[in-house]
């Protein structure tokens, strides 16, 4: 049986927490930032826990985490 490959783009985007869930960054913080509010941009810097519907897909991408 060959080894299962890890999807490298997913391994860079998701980090596993101690409880076994995955964290990810929020979107909309790359460009066109001058018209966005400072409070809004500060909230975008925080990490968010992945939803359970996406959790099953990420488990397929990252078999060894």
From Swiss-Prot:
SUPFAM superfamilies named in the record: L35p-like
Keywords linked to the UniProt accession: Ribonucleoprotein, Ribosomal protein
A single GO BP: translation
One Pfam family recorded for the sequence: Ribosomal_L35p
UniProt signal peptide: none
Superkingdom of this protein's organism: Bacteria
Chloroplast keyword on record: no
PROSITE patterns listed in its UniProt record: RIBOSOMAL_L35
GO cellular component annotations of the record: cytosolic large ribosomal subunit
UniProt xrefs under Gene3D superfamilies: 4.10.410.60
Gene Ontology MF term list: structural constituent of ribosome
Family under the similarity heading: Belongs to the bacterial ribosomal protein bL35 family.
Entry protein name: Large ribosomal subunit protein bL35
Species whose genome carries this gene: Buchnera aphidicola subsp. Cinara cedri (strain Cc)
């Amino acid at each position: 049986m060959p080894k299962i490959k890890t999807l490298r783009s997913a391994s860079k985007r998701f980090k596993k927490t101690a409880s076994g869930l995955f964290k990810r960054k929020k979107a909309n913080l790359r460009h066109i930032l001058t018209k966005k509010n400072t409070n809004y941009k500060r909230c975008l810097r925080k990490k968010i826990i992945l939803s359970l519907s996406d959790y099953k897909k990420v488990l397929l991408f990252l078999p060894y985490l």
